[in-house]
């Protein structure tokens, strides 16, 4: 091996090792708007991963004291989940266009039964159990059917939204929704393009008597949408735009204010003008709200929830979890993990920390990925369920009570 080849190999190993080290459970990150480079500080790249079968007995890594097990596997593009009062788990599976019901009939922490609860959908995403109904969203509508404990097949689906369909945009197809403490139903619709001012899209709507009423805008692809428990405080995790370099624009998690504008397409991360769009609407740049928590650009946040269970240590109660589905267009891979956002006095403290990692190996080129976390749910025993649409597995993360030594 020549000196140049040896140097390249050493640098590759160092970069890969750093990437893996940056994925340790418990490691904390604080990205500030003042830390951001100028647009095009690095060239835009396409750096797609190679998805591989899960190697041997590889498992996601969680902080000390937590145990990771398999709740269900052999799924097909496992996306988002909801846990019913009786412990059944409703899961959206994208390509089969169906909602699957998973049941742990023996109460051993493994789904030993599965049923097709609803099919014939179009790219289903969101699912929830709310006030006697199972709600499902796809690109046609939000639907609902009566929740019958123990039933394994949905009754007739009733359309909740009146729009002809919810496809509306071609680029971002997820249609997640959330219910507030007052019963308000919110729906997210992502943008049609990477960067454009096409509407509707890049918005959150309030669903009132089936009509979609604008609630907040400037949110390019707000996949993760959730109310803080017991409140009407709506939080969202957003996939920002591509093409500005490795570090731009940061994805984010933030409180959504009624009528709030969060930048897209005119600006990013507050009042940073988009290099192609910003000059046309300085008024919109000036009114853009800076988000609460920033993630590295291209991390692709998806599933988002607040922890409400009793299994985890008390300090986790009320904190948020966000799954980062992972990058495709940055020279250094980012995401592929679940992160925790600590809250204090009802508000996020600013940063985030690794919670569930180990889904990829940066030592190969192209880098190899065997897991991509998406949906999150709190199971009936207080454990955290994580849907993974690469290994098509639902992971179960349980805290093992530590006995005090004598």
Where is each model-derived feature located?
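Structural WD40 beta-propeller signal
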Residues: 74, 84, 130, 178-180, ...
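Blade-loop segments of beta-propeller domains
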Residues: 78-79, 99-132
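Beta-propeller domain segments
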Residues: 22-63, 174, 191-194, 202, ...
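Hydrophobic core register within WD40 beta-propeller blades
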Residues: 81, 127, 177, 222-225, ...
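Surface loop/turn motifs at the tips and blade-to-blade linkers of beta-strand repeat domains
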Residues: 70-75, 115-120, 160-169, 214-218, ...
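Short loop/turn segments immediately following the C-termini of beta-strands
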Residues: 93-94, 139-141, 147, 190-192, ...
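Conserved beta-propeller blade signature
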Residues: 88-92, 133-136, 143, 184-188, ...
């Amino acid at each position: 091996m020549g000196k140049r080849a040896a140097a390249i190999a050493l640098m590759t190993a160092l970069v890969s090792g750093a990437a893996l080290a940056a994925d340790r459970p418990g490691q904390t990150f604080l990205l500030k708007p003042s830390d951001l480079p100028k647009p095009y500080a690095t060239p835009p790249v396409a750096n797609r991963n190679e998805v591989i079968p899960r190697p041997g007995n590889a498992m996601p890594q969680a902080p000390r004291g937590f145990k990771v097990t398999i709740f269900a596997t052999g799924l097909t593009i496992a996306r988002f989940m909801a846990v019913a009062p009786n412990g059944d788990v409703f899961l959206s599976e994208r390509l089969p266009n169906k909602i699957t019901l998973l049941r742990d009939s023996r109460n051993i922490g493994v789904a030993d039964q599965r049923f097709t609860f609803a099919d014939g959908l179009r790219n289903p995403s969101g699912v929830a159990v709310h006030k006697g109904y199972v709600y499902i969203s796809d690109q046609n509508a939000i639907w609902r059917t009566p929740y019958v404990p123990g039933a394994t097949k949905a009754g007739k689906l009733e359309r909740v939204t009146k729009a002809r369909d919810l496809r509306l945009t071609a680029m971002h197809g997820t249609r997640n929704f959330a219910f507030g403490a007052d019963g308000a139903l919110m729906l997210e619709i992502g943008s049609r393009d990477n960067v454009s001012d096409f509407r509707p899209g890049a918005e959150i709507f309030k669903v009132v008597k089936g009509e979609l009423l604008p609630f907040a805008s400037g949110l390019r692809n707000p996949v993760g949408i959730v109310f803080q428990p017991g409140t009407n405080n709506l939080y969202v995790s957003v996939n920002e735009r591509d093409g500005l370099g490795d570090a731009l624009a940061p994805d984010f998690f933030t409180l959504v204010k009624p009528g709030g504008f969060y930048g897209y397409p005119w600006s990013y991360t507050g009042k940073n003008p988009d290099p192609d769009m910003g000059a046309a609407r300085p008024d919109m740049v000036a009114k853009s709200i800076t988000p609460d928590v920033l993630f590295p650009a291209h991390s692709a946040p998806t599933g988002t929830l607040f922890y409400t269970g009793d299994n985890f240590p008390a300090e986790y109660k009320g904190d948020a979890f966000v799954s980062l589905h992972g990058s495709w267009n940055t020279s250094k891979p980012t995401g592929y993990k679940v992160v925790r956002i600590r809250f204090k006095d009802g508000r996020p403290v600013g940063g985030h920390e690794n919670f569930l990692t180990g889904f990829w190996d940066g030592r190969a080129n192209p880098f190899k990925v065997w897991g991509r976390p998406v949906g999150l749910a709190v199971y009936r025993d207080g454990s955290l369920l994580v849907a993974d649409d690469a290994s098509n597995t639902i992971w179960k993360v349980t805290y093992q009570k530590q006995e005090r030594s004598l």
